[in-house]
Amino acid sequence: PKFQTGLNNMESVVLNKMDKYTINVDGVIQHGGGYYMYTTTASKISQVDEKMASMFSEVSTYMDENGIEKSGNPFVLYNEWNENSGNVIFSAGIFTPSEVITPAASEILTGFLPNQKVLKTTLKGDYKNLKEAWDTAYNYIEANDLEIAEDTKNFEVHLTSPENVANPAKWITHLYIPVK
């Protein structure tokens, strides 16, 4: 019984450490933008986390198979977000140093993110805390009288992933909201 109690206590400590997270609003910066390869889907908001991993893999595999250089970390571009319906249209992409022309039938496309002023927020922790991180960023915008640039889209860059960092408390995601 004492051994089992000890194991249960140890498990509790480990799980608590894995649940730790921090959200930091880094401030307004200039994001350099650039070309990227991507694929897009529509889904329920609750499915973004599970879908993005396979989409990143699909884009990465396409780039590897076609000898296309990667520059930077995978990112998610939110094309449309509808809280009322619970639906989202998003793209999963990987930056590349130059424009790539893809065949007409390709599921993987090329896009360009402009150099733009953005509010940068950093989440260190599990993706389940992303909503709180986005809410924190929007609250900062409101509290500091910043104006959202409506003609561009929010995006998040994943510096780490579950594939290469097992502990969710160590995952790092940068959130970017374009501002004027």
What function would you assign to each model-found segment?
Residues 1-180:
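A solvent-exposed interaction/effector surface
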